[in-house]
């Protein structure tokens, strides 16, 4: 029994470490997209040099940190469920968490698509739209952390209202930042 508990704690620790790495990669990746997009509207020499550098940085960040962290997050998360499936698979908060994780995985792959579009100069989004895209990952982080920490003590009505309030607050902050920059 001690080995199972110790094994679970190690798996849980690794899961948390790779969640942190995954989110760090997603946050920084979209930040690179914003800089990359802004560089694409600059003078030709600057655009060429900076775009090439951003492409290298994006490629390394995506394939060395972000995507492996996603895979390991899912692997260790699934391992935790296997080790304690009697508990996790009966918990409503876990079902909702898994839904958010699925949406986060879709966000991950759409972010990869954005990377290819921006590198081919086909992305039609503005830097402000990319900032809003970046805040969506923040919403996933807030939702997942609150679900895991508060579990069933969370009043779902307050949780839902709070989730949308955070989203609205982030949108307002991005809009204010845009006005401040102008």
Q: Model-predicted segments: where are they?
A:
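Polytopic transmembrane helical bundles with strong interfacial aromatic enrichment
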Residues: 2-182
